[in-house]
Amino acid sequence: MTLRKINFVTGNAKKLQEVKEILKGFEVTNVDVDLNEYQGEPEFIAQKKCQEAVEAVKGPVLVEDTSLCFNAMGGLPGPYIKWFLTNLKPDGLYNMLTGFADKTAYAQCIFAYTEGLGKPIHVFAGKCPGQIVAPRGDTSFGWDPCFQPDGFEETFGEMDKDVKNEISHRSKALDLLKEYFEKN
């Protein structure tokens, strides 16, 4: 049996590493295409990125859009987390909730996949509920040090990567992608 090849369009080395670890048994190749940053609902953003990526790659592509949503703020920063994190860092994200009793949040990951130009785009979403805490642990991957998933005493930044890759929003979305591949 040959491995299914997946062209994952990302410029984020840490995301690529996690996707490769979660999709063991697949041949994941990184394609670095500079995609536009779209605004809107996360599923719309993922679909637009997938359309743009397939036009550049001219073959099967997988793209991802990640959100970190604070319940006290009606879901913000949501899909704009990249910009918030760039400017505020994990400490600033935590401090955003200083005036709120509700520190609950959820991490959401939307993958969009298509076999090629003119083919349908399939969307796979995963969510991980948790709370925003003072940053702890490894600070090398985005907001991981300030997100503590429900049922755990550790932040994503403190967790063993194998544990994180079993429970994360990314792994939940990729589990749905694997199910799709098993059927198609």
Swiss-Prot record:
Major site of localization recorded for this protein: cytoplasm
Record: residues binding Mg(2+): E37
Annotated keywords: Cytoplasm, Hydrolase, Magnesium, Manganese, Metal-binding, Nucleotide metabolism, Nucleotide-binding
Family annotation (CDD domains): HAM1 (cd00515)
GO terms classed as biological process: deoxyribonucleoside triphosphate catabolic process; nucleoside triphosphate catabolic process; nucleotide metabolic process
Pfam families given in the database record: Ham1p_like
Record's catalysed reaction(s): ITP + H2O = IMP + diphosphate + H(+); dITP + H2O = dIMP + diphosphate + H(+); XTP + H2O = XMP + diphosphate + H(+)
E.C. no: 3.6.1.66
Function recorded in the entry: Pyrophosphatase that hydrolyzes non-canonical purine nucleotides such as inosine triphosphate (ITP), deoxyinosine triphosphate (dITP) or xanthosine 5'-triphosphate (XTP) to their respective monophosphate derivatives. The enzyme does not distinguish between the deoxy- and ribose forms. Probably excludes non-canonical purines from RNA and DNA precursor pools, thus preventing their incorporation into RNA and DNA and avoiding chromosomal lesions.
Protein name: Inosine triphosphate pyrophosphatase
Source organism of the structure: Caenorhabditis briggsae
